[in-house]
Each structure stands twice: as structure tokens, then as C-alpha cells.
Amino acid sequence: MKQEPHRQSEEKEKPKGPMAVEREHHTSLSSGTTMTASTGDESTNSRPVESSQTEKSLSLRIRILKQLGFDDIQELNACDTGLVEQFLNVRLINDTKELEKIRESNLAKLNQIIDKCMESDKISDSTLNKILDMSMNRDTNNDNNNHLTIPSPITTKKRKINASELASPRGHRRYRSDIPTVSEVETGVGYPQIHQQPGAYTLPMPANQWMSNPYMQPPQPQVQQIMPQYLYPPGMGPQAQLPTMSSNSESQTPVMSSQFLSLNQHGLYQQNIGAHPVMSMGPQANIYGQQHQPQPGQERDQSRKSFSHRRSQSANISMANFRSPMRNPQPASSQRPVNFLIHTPKHPPPT
């Protein structure tokens, strides 16, 4: 019976709460070895730091909840971090909605003011434009101050395109699409077109003053004589007369007959230029209207072809010995073949 009041007195002397439990644990460990005592000291040093951090975070959350409008914080769990974040998001959404309402009200007021200014005669349009320009400049300045100016690739490209052409000699580039097209009517210059109209065929006429010197006669183009098919019926047209060869015909060329008179009388050279005549060649006619005959100069030189020079053979050209029937209907005299070879001491003329 004496031991029970002693136990009750010991229980009264013991403090209550978590701190008392820690003290009892500490006293119990202190009775052990030295190692257990040292570990107990480290745990007591770390726990006060953690408790201080948790107390600070709780105080901040309580303040935030009070600012959000929650007075009865005891009903909420302040230790729950997700709950506080949700309340913060709701507060941000409400603030943005209020800002939008204020902006809409300001715009409505501005519209009313502008309408009244337009209706009144005292305020002119120039003053309104000045006010609008001032507001626009203020907005642009605010945007430039708030945002960083970063050069975009679009602006750099425009600067390169609009750069001056004097920077480099290769800067001036013109394309075919940039060159304006000019018509022939504006310039007054007409370019010849192919096959516009058929041309009239004329025969060459050699010069009389060059008949004496065979080496000074100019070369004449060989013009093809065209026999019209529609002027004469078959078998009734003029026939080409063949020349007769004599013993001394080495230096003579065949003489044309007077068929040009009959052709001229029937109107060979008086055809319509704009028409397209149908013409054909005779079966046995060459470019001069005669039968092809070997040249006598070539027959004479067959025996000494191996001894003569090559240039002397290719330079002999027989010229036409007749005039145009339009100018001189009489047959012209015969002439020698023309040699256009330029003779030198190294290459003398043929003998």
C-alpha cells in the first residue's frame, strides 16, 4: 500500500506531450553506452531544423489562404500543397476575367467619346487623328519596352533585296521578264520574213568592157532557167536547139538560140508576182536550157592530166555567152573560158 502513492507521485512529476516522450527516450538512452548517446545528440540537432521549415511553409500557406478570402483556416488542411495550388489557379482566372471586363468597359466609353466628338462641330478631324496617333505611338512604345527586339529573317531578306545596286558591280541584275517588249510598229523597223512572195527570175548579163581580158571578168551566178508548163500544149513548146561542134571548138562555148524571143513574146517574164506558178524542167535540159556536154578543155587535157598541176584544172570556168532577152535579143559573140586562178612564179599559168 505504501508503494502506490510513491508511483502516483512519479507519474505526476512526468511531463506530458511529445517533448516529454523524447526526454524519456533520451534519458533511457543516456543510461546505455557512449555510442548511443552520440546518435541521440545528432537526431536532436536535425529535428529542430526540419520543424522550423515546416512551420514557415505552414505560415505562408495560411497567409495565402487569408488573402484568397478564407477566414476559417481551421476547417481546411493547410498542409495539403495541391489544395493551395488549386485555390491559386482559381484566383488567377478570376483576376483575368475582371481585367477583360474592365477593358470592355473602357472600349465602350471610348466609342461613346469618339461618337460625341464626331457629332460636335468644335472638334475637327485633325485633332481626332492626332489623338489616335498619340495613342498608337504609346502602344508601340510599350510593346517595344516589354518585348525584346529580335531581328527576323524576313526583315533581313527585305534589306538584301532593297539594297543599293552601287554596293557591288554585280548587284545590277536584269531578267528577261523585266525588259519591256517593243513592237515593230512602234519602232518602224520591219524584219524580213521568209517566203513572203515569190521573186522574179532574171538571167545574168556579162559586161562588154571585160570581154577582151578573160582574167578580169567577174564570176556570174548560174541561174536556173525554168520552163513554164502551162504556156504551151504538150509537143508544141519551144525546143532547145543543140549546138554543132566543129574542129576548132576548143575555145568556143555553145551559143544559145533565139528561143528567148518567143518566150518573151508569150510573156514568160510578165507573170504575176503574187501568184504561185507551177513550173517544171525539161527532160534533157541543164541549168542553161541545153543538153549537158563535156567541156573540150577537159578532153584535151586527158592525156597530160598526170603532168599538169591540180590548181590549173579546177580554175577553168566557162562563162555564159548570152545576154538577157529583155535587154539584147541578138545573140552575143563567143568567149574563152575564164580562169580565176592567181598565178605566181611558183604556180605559172598553164600552157
Swiss-Prot record:
The keyword Nucleotide-binding does not apply. Phosphorylated by CDC28. Its main location: nucleus. Residues 28-56, 241-256, 287-296 have a biased composition (Polar residues). Residues 1-27 have a biased composition (Basic and acidic residues). Disulfide bonds: none annotated. Belongs to the POG1 family. This is Transcriptional activator POG1. It comes from Saccharomyces cerevisiae (strain YJM789) (Baker's yeast).
